[in-house]
Amino acid sequence: MFDAFTKVVAQADARGQFISTSEIDALAAMVSGRNKRLDAVSRISNNASTIVASAARELFAQQPALISPGGNAYTSRRMAACLRDMEIILRYVTYSAFTGDASVLEDRCLNGLRETYLALGTPGTSVAAGVNLMKDAALSIVNDRAGISNGDCASLSSEIGTYFDRAAASVA
C-alpha cells in the first residue's frame, strides 16, 4: 500500500524525472482537501454499524430468499458472517478514502474475494447489491453538509464512490 505521495515519488523515480508541476499541484489539492477527507472518513467510521445494518435490511427486503430457509444468510451464524463481510468491505473502503489510494482495498480485501464467495456458493450479485446499498448509505452521510468542513465535496464523494464500485465489481 502506498500513499499518494509515495506513489508520485515512485512513479517519478521510475521515469528518472523530477516530480512534475502537475503532480505537485494534484498533491497540493489533495492536502488542501484533507480536512474534508478526514471528515468523510470519520463520518463513515462513526456510522459504520448503521450503514451496514441499513444496507443489510434493504438487501434482505429486496432479496428475501437470502434469509429464507436454505438461503445464504439463513441462520444467525450465516447472517453474522454476511454482516461481518459487509463491515470488512466498508472498513477497507474507509482506508482507501483515508489514503486516497485503492491499493489497500484491492490487495487486502478484494484480492481473491470473488473466488472465496464462489467456493462458498454465495451469490456474488447479492454481495455486489449489498456493497452498492452501503455506498448509497455512506455517500448520503458524507454528503450531509451539517458539521462538515466548508467546500465542495463532489470530487471526494465521487472518489469514495469508486472504491465501493471496485468492491461491487470484484464480487459480481
UniProtKB/Swiss-Prot annotation:
The record's gene field reads rpcB
Q: Does the keyword Transcription apply?
A: no
InterPro entries, per database record: Globin-like_sf, Phycobilisome_asu/bsu, Phycobilisome_asu/bsu_sf, Phycocyanin_b
Q: How does it assemble?
A: Heterodimer of an alpha and a beta chain.
Biological processes per GO annotation: photosynthesis
For membrane topology, the record states:
Peripheral membrane protein
Arranged from A to Z, the UniProt key words for this protein are: Antenna complex, Bile pigment, Chromophore, Electron transport, Membrane, Methylation, Photosynthesis, Phycobilisome, Thylakoid, Transport
Q: What is the lineage of its organism?
A: Bacteria, Bacillati, Cyanobacteriota, Cyanophyceae, Synechococcales
The record's similarity note reads: Belongs to the phycobiliprotein family.
> PTMs?
Contains two covalently linked bilin chromophores.
Q: What is its main location?
A: membrane
Protein name (Swiss-Prot/TrEMBL): R-phycocyanin-2 beta chain
